[in-house]
Curated annotation (Swiss-Prot):
It comes from the Bacteria. The lineage of its organism: Bacteria, Bacillati, Cyanobacteriota, Cyanophyceae, Synechococcales. InterPro entries: O-mannosyl-transferase_TMTC, PSI_Ycf3_assembly, TPR-like_helical_dom_sf, TPR_rpt. One of its GO terms (cellular component) is plasma membrane-derived thylakoid membrane. It is found in: Cellular thylakoid membrane. It comes from Synechococcus sp. (strain JA-2-3B'a(2-13)) (Cyanobacteria bacterium Yellowstone B-Prime). Keywords: Membrane, Photosynthesis, Repeat, Thylakoid, TPR repeat. Coiled coil: none annotated. This is Photosystem I assembly protein Ycf3.
Amino acid sequence: MPRSMKNDNFIDKTFTVMADLILKLLPGVSSEQKKAFAYYRDGMAAQSEGEYAEALENYREALALEQGEEDRSYILYNMGLIYQSNGELDKALEYYHQALELNPRLCSALNNIAVLLHHKGELSLQAGDEETAEALFNEAAQYWIRAIRIAPNNYIEAQNWLKTTGRANLEVY
């Protein structure tokens, strides 16, 4: 039984049953696509329970089967989330960048890249490397600006940071 069916949550079980029914009824959905979706769904279930190794395994299987670029971008993004949660920031950045290559309008990936770059900038500042910190802050600003241009009502803290640091070279309203 797939992990997603083991969940005791009624809403999750209902979603899983509905998703399975939709997949069965949709014409043109290959068995590979169905398998990819099942692995992705099981990866999300494992990730939500903090079972990151299992989630990554499912995401890798889904990635091997999935053909659609947008769907692949979300798989890569979720893998980045896991690496970020585990403190593997450089690896998380790699996965977020891969997700953006497939889906340049994935705001959450843009935001997470900016957050990680800002964090690295703070670490550089603490280490006394102001030049590297400034470069990282400027790079973070560029990612936040891209995200804000796509979703102007989001990332209010980032917008405030951009304004207070003089890096806001855009009008979003």
